[in-house]
Amino acid sequence: MTYIATRSFTDPDSYYESIGGVGPVEGIITARGNFHATLTCVNFSRLWMRRGEDSLARVAIYTPRMARTTMMFATDQDQPARHIAGVERQPDEVTVVSLGSSEHVRTSAAARWGAVTLPPEDLAALGQAINGRELTPPSFTHHVKPSKSAILRLRSLHEAVGHLAKKAPDILARSEVARAMEEALQEAIVFCLASAEPVHVSSAHRHHARIMRRLEEALHANSNGPVYMSELCAAVGTSYSTLRDCCQERLGMSPKRYLWLRRMHLARRDLCRADPEKSSVTEIATSYGFWELGRFAVAYRTLFGESPSMALRRPPDDPKPGENAESPWQFIKSA
């Protein structure tokens, strides 16, 4: 069975939640402006792919599913470099995410990205069959630079699948077409990894990765209210200066700025989803530690382009799949 879905978004939270399948994704927009994004999801028999485009600079936190190996890349060369796990990555590199990690992906402008995932045992078998050696999941996230022909082939196939998913999903859903496209993508992935030059990662970089993973775990454990810096440093088990260096490296901002942006986005999420008859701006703002409501309202408008009260009153921009007959999702499933 092939699962195909395409969708457009104006709400970043709905966008990140919908990426799914490749693993939980959270995001924080770091630039002002009107957000819009598109997402294409195709799940073949073994290989799953995602293809997205988003309009504003952001930090996304990606936690891969334990049962799948994830490979991420830029879908075209003509865009700014991204920072993945604190290191600037060029558009012609592929990131192979380690199982059980939590990686930060930071962009400075609009981004066009692709991802493919495979069960580790399938990737190993494909490597053995196509290249004569098994391809095993890395113990830590690493970055490789494939040959020019290999990355161009991967991008071309990924784009072709994305085009069919949008313009002719009924054709892509045919078993013979889906099988051919899946096999071609799997071969392209193996050739990318087999032809690649590894990019060195230092031991200090891996230590910072562990600190950032503990940071995200601590934030998730306290996701329903404010988190104070002294408590956070204690939970992470490091000093503020070390945490500051890690956040600057991975997020491009201080931990205080990151916490503030995170609280603002959580407040926005709750405002956009709350029932205005049962909730108030004051209740939601104070639940995230914003006690000075006037300053909160000004900061909210500056960051999101509308007042908190407007966000509370208007209906959600991006209803979830199945909520109504006008769902923006387009689904196709083959037999």
Where are these regions (language model features)?
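Alpha-helical bundle regulatory/interaction domains
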Residues: 1-35, 80-223, 228-230, 234-240, ...
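A short glycine-rich, His/Asp/Glu-containing loop-to-beta-strand
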Residues: 14-19, 35-56
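Glycine- and acidic-residue-biased ligand/ion/polar-headgroup-sensing regions
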Residues: 45-47, 54-83
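Short, conserved glycine- and acidic-residue-centered signature motifs
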Residues: 64, 208, 260
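Generic hydrophobic, amphipathic alpha-helix propensity
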Residues: 211-215, 259-264
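C-terminal structural cap/anchor segments
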Residues: 238, 248, 257-260
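Short hydrophobic/aromatic patch on the recognition helix
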Residues: 243, 247, 295-296, 300
